[in-house]
């Protein structure tokens, strides 16, 4: 094989093995299945050397998945290119019902040569670290909710009822400390559930404190601070958005960012009939959930609260102007859509979609180091 050729190398990556296939860039060249290799660095080095004996330019391709981006970061150090592609956007034949590692690797190589794959954005190492910390906080919130549900379900089975106003406030916690269960065994269960709630609460507090500390030295911290100029976008929402998306300005238009977050309507159009449905829900669920949570703040009339004013004081006037423009626009739109009989959840998602555009506009005003 000529040393001037480019090889496209498809890899179906798993925890302990990688299925490998390759094809030359020449039209009509046959896709060759190489076999399965291990996932150690020495196995990857051996594969690179073998492929380099066949061509000078190597392009490795694999699907984004649970194995992360270590291959993407390792292969360029060996002088090769690497693409991470979106598995949900890989073309499939409707009648194809056979799926094996061999077929997947060969398909990746073939589609890479044809240019039919969509490459995903890979975050920098430090950006991914902040994202992991942000997601760990989300996991802690979920675990805390589950622990509270178990405790409340246990008390309900024992017909032990709290008659106060708010759960998990000081009065409720004092009441829990006085609860006596019918039997010693059930008292043990109750105390273990109480301890689980306390442990998950402490874990959540630790992660939130660590996230606050780590973001201070993060290269994208200026964007996090600027996004907090928007109503409903406090620290956790802002850091979730930036950690999950990265540099918002990598999207050329706000609509591209809306599409990435799955906030645009689905559509089925045939002939002269056009149907639009619910949002696509494609893309990043973590960012979309945080965005919708922040959008609920616009159900009230436009107003600069004391907390928002404190955040605005540290920011340039151009960002303050965008913040107020967003409030006026989104609060009016919320009331208008509700008055037309739209469900509150539908309205909030519509507000979230427009809120993304204002986030993009603010991010354009903030210089970010590479």
Please identify what each model-predicted range represents.
Residues 1-370:
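A detector of single, family-specific signature residues
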